[in-house]
Amino acid sequence: MAIIKYKPTTNGRRNMTSSDFAEITKKKPEKTLLESQSHTAGRNSYGHITVRHRGGGHKQKYRIIDFKRNKDDVKAVVKAIEYDPNRTANIALLHYTDGIKAYILAPKGLKVGAVVESGPDADIKPGNALPLSAIPAGTEIHNIELKPGKGGQLVRSAGTVAQVLGNDGKYTLVRLQSGEVRKILSTCRATIGSVGNEQHSLIQLGKAGRSRWLGKRPQSRGSVMNPNDHPHGGGEGKAPVGRPQPMTPWGKKSRGIKTRNSKARSEKLIIRHRKGNK
């Protein structure tokens, strides 16, 4: 993947960049692996806004991704690398030897024609899925399960990667993208390699319209609101916050406050917290 920079022919193009989509080999998705999805614009079943700044955006079909990778000892050939509008990573279309088709997250370096498989005896190469107990220390992994058989939940965004540090009996030590080191059950599965499309974070939208295509609505600063709408609102002209520290719209401190529950049961599985929480 390479980043395309545009000539400043308009104000919207001046700082715009995009992907060249060189890795994409197929434009139309596999129809049997599509589902319709409706968007709620950040509203719940009562019609109340529960997530602000959501709404609009282009219609999208959901691609059914195989996060479980539990089809053991059946080899599959990579038939295409496709774009997925629902995630930052690209996806790979697999054709299994028994006729089944499936989508997986496309790891970095996976090419059309490559053969991938799952199971404890699979080779250590990008795209193969194994239990953590069968993955040697130092191996880069992604799409990591937290509960055996539930499907990958960790390290699924474009360019992310985790590393196996070693096996400790029932658990395997894994260093995540954030720097956190935690124990994960050795029977949980993970996929070898890092997630592809690693330059996605370098893309600049360049104009407000591209945010609207993605379903993101404008966000107003609290300081330009009325005092009944935000703790920062009110005052004459450009008034300061007027409080010891910035607040959320609901009156809670917004900086330096830990949001993780210190009594969570998974706390005992974390060996070292992420870099921001030293």
From Swiss-Prot:
Domain of life: Bacteria
UniProt region (Disordered), positions on chain: 210-278
Gene Ontology MF terms in the entry: rRNA binding; structural constituent of ribosome; transferase activity
Any one Gene Ontology cellular component term annotated for this protein: large ribosomal subunit
GO biological process: cytoplasmic translation
PROSITE patterns documented for this protein: RIBOSOMAL_L2 (PS00467)
Keywords noted in UniProt: Ribonucleoprotein, Ribosomal protein, RNA-binding, rRNA-binding
Assembly and oligomerization: Part of the 50S ribosomal subunit. Forms a bridge to the 30S subunit in the 70S ribosome.
Record PANTHER family: LARGE RIBOSOMAL SUBUNIT PROTEIN UL2M (PTHR13691:SF5), RIBOSOMAL PROTEIN L2 (PTHR13691)
Family of the protein in this entry: Belongs to the universal ribosomal protein uL2 family.
Role noted for this protein: One of the primary rRNA binding proteins. Required for association of the 30S and 50S subunits to form the 70S ribosome, for tRNA binding and peptide bond formation. It has been suggested to have peptidyltransferase activity; this is somewhat controversial. Makes several contacts with the 16S rRNA in the 70S ribosome.
Protein name: Large ribosomal subunit protein uL2
Species of provenance: Lactobacillus johnsonii (strain CNCM I-12250 / La1 / NCC 533)
Encoding gene (name): rplB
